[in-house]
Amino acid sequence: MTHVLPLAGLAALAAFPAAAGETACWFENGVVVVPAEVLGVAADFILDTATAHTQLAETQAQTAGFEETALTGEVRLAGLNLAGATVAVADLDMRTGALPTPVAGVIGADLLKPYVLDVSFAPCRVRLSLRGRAPRFPARTRLKLTWVAGRPAVDATVSDGEHTITGAFAPGVGADRAIRISDATAHVEGAAKPKELYPYGILEPRLRTLSFGGEVSEDVTGGLIAAEDPQLAGEIGAPFLSRYRLRFDFPAGRLLLAPSR
């Protein structure tokens, strides 16, 4: 599949279109990707509300002449200039290798937190609004957002039929599995290659139910994620969230869900 978005998106960054604060994106291989400019590196970036810190890929950082692993500068995203951004340099080869076009990093929750973020998956569009300036959103469900380990989190319940886990899950538009559970609270017995249960692995165990936003979904693709905080039960990824239109109202502490178009 051929994508023309990167060129169009970067042109939009330079021109600042009338719909300031909004940009086209693309959704493939389970993640949302947006055009952005991070510390002068203009490229495609994964947008992920479940990643705590914004990252620039090691290869792109070296090409741009950066030697440090912790950087500070300007990020341009969806027509907005985000000054004073802290960006970590990281090896992202495993995370970006399966994507059909080069990706230079990850826009994380730290940059998004001051804004209202709207995400639609079909067609894929992202909008950032200042507090109190977001357009009307036809929410069907409103969920409380808390913050755990630098990530937004909502309550959800997952079950394999024998065991049930209820806790705080980070909703991630750049997370590539419907749900991943912290390995501090779950494991898969008898897995021949347990590492393949983690991000970028090939195993896709099925979970019987996921209760989220007042609805129960069955036969959900799952996996594990390395524990980072005992209060974080896991993450809910874009393959599941794409059934909705989303509004992350970070200033108000709410996640709003609307039916997909």
Please place each PLM-identified region on the residue numbering.
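Positively charged n-region of N-terminal signal peptides that target proteins for export
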Residues: M1-V4
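Bacterial N-terminal signal peptides
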Residues: P6-A15
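Pepsin/retropepsin-fold aspartyl endopeptidases
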Residues: F16-R261
